[in-house]
């Protein structure tokens, strides 16, 4: 009769998207080294005096999860990522800045051929280091890069949508009510775990199937993210957002 236990879903499923030929475990050490050497050859110019050090790195990870519950759930799913990045330390007039370009993909082949983008980013950082001036204090109209907009949305809105934060916070419960207008009509935000992208999880770490959860539609609050506990306490539906760092940690509500 426990309301939290009642919320737990029972699925029997196998979702192995990365177990075939493109599994990163099939990529040899020599192939990873060749990827690093490729970017060193294409993107490292030792004749630029302002670049005092640089680094090229790559890594990969494959994870297969088996989930079983006393209610009868049996779920097998997998996930993989691989990365490559080029970073530069740039010193101009005694001031050191650093920057570069980083790629996170599902398959090694998708990490190749980005040298033009890396060089463009390197030149942007060089231009900044050489020519940037102090901004005068004041109010400005700013055009934000997509990555900056995403970070603001993640930090200022996304974490507030994680329902476990409000369980013991009466003020937040009163402030963050469904139907409240909190943003522009141009802003709609959706959370999905089954999209093949960063954060992919067709089932969360409580065995809940991923859902399409509209957090905001045209600036109006329409949903929030739950695990079984927060959904039971607030009387709302599961969203599939109980995420555990690993089997050694309890799941938490996260985007």
Residue ranges of each PLM-predicted region?
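Acidic low-complexity segments
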Residues: 1-77, 110-150
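Broad gene-expression machinery/nucleic-acid interaction feature
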Residues: 53, 74, 81-85, 139, ...
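Fold-independent oxyanion-binding glycine-rich loops
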Residues: 56-61, 89-91, 145-147, 191-194, ...
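Short acidic, glycine/serine/threonine-rich loops at helix termini
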Residues: 62-79, 96-102, 152-158, 200-203, ...
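Acidic, His- and aromatic-enriched active-site or binding-groove loops in soluble protein domains
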Residues: 74-87, 161-173
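Short beta-strand elements
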Residues: 75-105, 215-217
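Extended active-site and interfacial segments that coordinate phosphate-rich ligands
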Residues: 83, 103-109, 160-168, 229-244
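Dual-mode signal for accessory low-complexity, basic/Gly-rich regions
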Residues: 175-255
């Amino acid at each position: 009769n426990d309301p939290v236990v009642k919320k737990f879903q029972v699925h029997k499923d196998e979702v192995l998207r990365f177990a075939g030929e493109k599994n990163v475990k099939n990529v040899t050490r020599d192939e990873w080294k060749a990827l690093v050497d490729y970017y060193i050859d294409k993107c490292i110019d030792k004749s630029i005096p302002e670049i005092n050090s640089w680094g090229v790195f790559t890594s990969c990870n494959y994870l297969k999860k088996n989930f079983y519950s006393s209610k009868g759930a049996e779920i097998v799913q997998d996930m993989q990522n691989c990365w490559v990045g080029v970073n530069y330390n740039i010193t101009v007039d005694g001031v050191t800045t650093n920057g570069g370009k980083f790629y996170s993909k599902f398959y090694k082949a998708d990490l190749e051929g980005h040298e033009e983008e890396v060089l463009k980013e390197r030149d942007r950082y060089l231009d900044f280091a050489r020519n940037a001036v102090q901004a005068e204090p004041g109010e400005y109209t700013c055009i934000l890069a997509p990555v900056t907009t995403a970070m603001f949305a993640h930090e200022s809105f996304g974490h507030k949508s994680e329902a476990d934060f409000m369980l013991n916070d009466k003020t937040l419960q009163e402030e963050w009510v469904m139907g409240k207008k909190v943003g522009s009509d141009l802003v709609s935000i959706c959370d999905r775990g089954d999209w093949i992208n960063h954060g992919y999880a067709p089932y969360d770490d409580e065995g809940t199937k991923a859902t399409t959860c509209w957090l905001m539609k045209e600036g109006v609050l329409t949903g929030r993210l739950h695990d079984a506990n927060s959904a039971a306490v607030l009387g709302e539906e599961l969203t599939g957002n109980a995420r555990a760092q690993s089997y050694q940690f309890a799941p938490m509500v996260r985007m």
